[in-house]
Amino acid sequence: MSGLAAAVRLSMFGQKVLLLEKHNAAGGLNSFYARGNRKYDVGLHALTNWVPEGAKGTPLTKLLRQLRIKREELDLCPQLGSLIKMGGKELRLNNQFQDLVEDVAAVFPRSIDQFKALDHYISSLDETSLEGQGGSARALLDEKLSDPLLRDMLLLPTCFYGSALENDIEVSQFAIMWRSLFKEGFARPFIGVRQVIRLLLDRCREHQVDRRMKCGVKQIVVRNTRAVALILDDGTEVTTDKIYSSAGAVETQRLRSDCSPQVAQSEIGRLGYLETISTYKPDDFSKFSWRETIIFFCDEERFNYQSPKSLVDPKSGVICIPNNYSYGSGRSLDEGWLRVTALANHDEWCRLPESEYLDQKTNWLNQLNRVARNHLKPIADAVHDGALTSTDVFTPRTVRKYTGHLNGAIYGSPVKRRDGRTDLENLFIIGTDQGFLGVTGAMLSGISMANLHGLKE
């Protein structure tokens, strides 16, 4: 998606752009796939940074302006309401920051002044600065907040939605998440990520971007300090003045003709995820009375955000119910949907023989469904199972197969390159490893890097 946004931005100013996509569906990590008659979103639990129409100076309004997209074209529908659940406590995330402040005051009365001071401090940071604000957010929270449970409850959603670091998140990324999750909020187009991709593809066609699908890059040819050509999977050589790569920083290095295929091993991300998707008969699903949009949960005393030693860590994760957005009168999804995400071990999943791999997908589908239902209004197993219409699971192995991201690391390398620069003067990193994450972040990444490296000369 960062590549689509960069292509649109560059082509708007008359630059000739070739957009190469390894797969047959656009969007990369923020895409969709079809199975049967259903289209499954990949990545999009919510489009973050939602603000009411008319709000100015926000990431959402910036990207709409820079891509010349009208807000109504996105068809954004705000969430009904989300929760952080841990240690028997709950905090609301419902697109109203004041409600979160009130919950902190009620649940952690001794910490409310500290929380307000923390908000003031984070709000003073320029979270989108391309220099970035290094350092540990966990250390920052240890310094600013005395209650360990409150610290963990704030790390829980920000890590799951934006950190490539184990057991921490960089301060600049934490500031981005603070704004996008807590101070602004969640929304979703009625048809999901396809709406965003459709708009970007329309803009690509409008500005004559040359798009080639199922056309991966085999090698980046390097001479001296420049990338001079691309060798495509079919052997075609393409020459270019500048290259913007959303393949990942390490993955991009390993494509270079002057680098070893094993370069930068220590910079590969370790955090993989498993996600289960279940669909339900709509009438039955409505009777479940599951009202939350997203639930960030942790069932342990302390929040551990690290690659598990076993296949999956079911003790913390994210529950998403895409039905629970305010779609407007007369509009509802055709089926009920339940998505559950948890940390998973890439290497352990890749070691499994095919038959055991399929068995374990079914096993963890059932286990995570049970975990999620422990955080939702109870329903009998027979009622639940009778309403079920389909299931699917993707693992770190799935992510690596279809995206090429090493270790199936959705958030990429823990080493981000905020200015997008590499040691080559005309090769730039966009997307996850530039440092802006999620759907909104991906588009802003493409826009920012196109502006900085392609339009300022």
How would you label these PLM feature ranges?
Residues 174-231:
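Helical element adjacent to the flavin cofactor pocket in flavoenzyme catalytic cores
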